A protein has these predicted regions:
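Loop/turn elements at helix/coil->beta-strand transitions in domains of secreted/extracellular proteins
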Residues: 96, 171-172
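Extracellular/periplasmic metallocenter environments
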Residues: 167
């Protein structure tokens, strides 16, 4: 399953000061939580392959059976938070329309992914699995410094200050 929660809010204030001045203040906030989920219990993923021919040394890589927690779902998710604020002041001077403004943007992205987070075991054959033979391949993903749900997080801020002159040369 893919649990996607999106929350978004905005605030817009438009003000007039006489006939030739106005201001717009706009703020928005968005939070996106996109977690991949499953109804499985945490259990290693096991691949049992189609068999191994000891005489020729050839491994049949066709999966005979696979079971366990899906390899790409454990601790797989993205969280984003975005805040934007804009404030624009406009002054009309006949042929010139001046606008001065400030802007601010904050973004945070948090991404987590742990392939093989519950462990992975691959057996050459059903017989190897049933007799307790050593797996042919094993994989574990362990978070840095022992973290159980590691993630990469990126944050940044962007500021802006601007002045614009909209000039109508001809009267229409």
């Amino acid at each position: 399953s893919l649990d996607k929660l999106v929350h978004s809010f905005s605030f817009d204030l438009n003000s007039r000061f006489g006939n030739n001045m106005s201001n717009q203040f706009l703020a928005t906030y968005t939070s996106i939580k996109d977690m991949r989920g499953t109804n499985s219990d945490i259990f290693p993923f096991i691949d049992i392959m189609g068999g191994y021919d000891a005489a020729t040394g050839v491994q049949d890589m066709t999966p005979y059976m696979s079971l366990g927690y899906e390899l790409f779902t454990y601790n797989n998710g993205v969280n984003n938070k975005i805040l934007t604020i804009n404030d624009n002041f406009t002054y009309n001077l006949g042929a010139h329309k001046l606008m001065a403004g400030l802007s601010f943007e904050y973004q945070m992205a948090n991404n987590s992914y742990m392939r093989n987070g519950t462990g992975y075991y691959r057996y050459r054959s059903l017989d190897d699995f049933l007799t307790g033979a050593e797996p042919e391949a094993i994989a574990f993903t362990i978070g840095y410094n022992g973290q159980t749900n590691p993630s990469a997080q990126v944050r940044f801020n962007q500021y802006g200050l601007y002045l614009q002159d909209e000039w109508n040369i001809n009267k229409n």
